[in-house]
Each structure stands twice: as structure tokens, then as C-alpha cells.
């Protein structure tokens, strides 16, 4: 892959990210954090896009830490705390860390795009009908928010039941219209049912990260949950790695289910090993374990870290109504949105 590969498409997608998603304005300080695993073609394109609209792009690049969701070194933490806009491309993101919370508290508009390369930028932003994607997200937000009983199952053995009891749903994939608010790559809505009502089994079958040793799953990882906490982890080698990683923190909050997330970015049709992309596989559901951010509007707690796992082809029932079946949306309005987005098979 040459430096010129998709160069025009990359620059167009970078401008779309800066101008239409992060809503960068002239004079704003745009801090871009990257590590040595970051695709610098993406970083350069985003810096050029920000500068072309007369913002002040500032790049901070550092060696990979090998640890996600943990506090970076002081110069990085200090810089992001005064950003108007913070775009994180570092493979090992620092979301949920103290500096993240400080930056959000100071009004930064933040997005986490860890692991994004030129193909991911073009496929998930540049070639997507972003206005339609945002509208679909708003519809799903309302649909889930109006439901109480949530049942998630699949052919691998996932069978999870919970109740929303009026909990709010966060559309994390919308433009950055609010100060002090994190937005994520388009194609995701997130929430947490009342934690104590979450009971059953989750079987991750596509991706799980961190720990770094996993990423793409070669075998299912089975979790048994009671009252919103992971009690047992079963499977093969990757399940054992995951079990040891969770235990290594010595933190009981690392076993708490933090969120449900529906994935629906039409540029992602299968797992790649980049979790920001994988948790948006079209039709998937992703579950977070560990820290739960305040913006999720759940119970809110801190933990030593956070991890995300993907169930690729769920069947989801909202108060008995089938939202999707085996990863394919069945609800009438959802099907119409899938057609507008140009998703194959609808």
C-alpha cells in the first residue's frame, strides 16, 4: 500500500470528520493524539483539514503504551485538558482515564478513533451517508429508550435478559454539538439497562479488546452474568487469557457490565481486529465491561480499565418485538433505513 493509496478519498473523509462530525470552527485548538501504531496518513489528512478551515491543529505522538484506558504521561494528559476538540487516534486509547474526565469537564469535544487507518476512515466516514446514519441512530435511540424488557440471544448460546426501567440511551455516533461530551464513530447507540436486572449468558464471537493478546476471536468466549456482574468465563485459550487479564487488576468493578451498544455502520461488515470498527459491525451488539462513564447515564463507576466484546449476529427483542434476527434488522422502519444506507440484502 503506497502513500498515495486512496489519497483523494482520505482527504475528503478527513474534511468530513473535521467539519461535519467534530464541527471544528476557526480558531479552535484541535489536539490530535497518536502513538507509534497510528496510521500517520490519517493524522496528516486530519491536520490539513483542520488547518484549512483556520483551526489550530496540534499533534502529540508517543510510543505505544501497551495499556488501553489508562492515564498517559503528564505532558499528554496536560495538553488534552485544554483542548477545544480532541481527536484520539492512538491505538491504546486513554478514554475513561483521569485526563479524559478532566478534558471532558473542561468542555472538550472528544472522539475516540483508535486504530483508524486509511481504509477505515474512507469506509466508515467518507463513503457513508452520514446524515442518514445519524438519523437511523436517532431512531434506534428512541426505539430502545421506549422499551423496558431487553432480550438478546444468538445461535452461539447468548441469552441475556434485562430491564431498562426508564434508562436513557446515548446516541454516541452523532455530530459533536455539545461541549464536554464524547462522541464516537458513527453507527452506534449505547446504554445500560438497570444493572441489577442483567442476567444470563453472553458469548463473544467476533472481537474482544483489550487485552492486546486477543482482538480478533478465534473461538467463542462465554460469560455468565448475575445482577450485572460477570461470575464465570468459559472457553478455550483466549477465554483463559481474558480471565487472567480481568483478575490482574484486583478490582471487583472490572467484572461489572458497563454498557450495551448496537452497531450499525454500513462500512463495517465483518471483524477486523480494530475494536472501534468491530463494535460497529452492521447488525452487531457490543458489550462493555469495567468502567462506566457518566455520559452513559447509568449508575456510573470507575474501574481500573475497560474492555469491549462483540456478538456479531444477535437476535434482539424489545418488549417482545423483534428488532433484529441473526444480525438482520426486521423492524419495518429499520429496514427502510438499511435500504437508504445501501446495505446489501435489504
Predicted regions and their residues:
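Internal helix-turn-beta structural module
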Residues: 274-345
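Short loop/turn microsegments at loop-to-beta-strand junctions
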Residues: 218-220, 311-312
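Short, surface-exposed beta-edge/turn micro-motifs
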Residues: 147, 199, 220, 257, ...
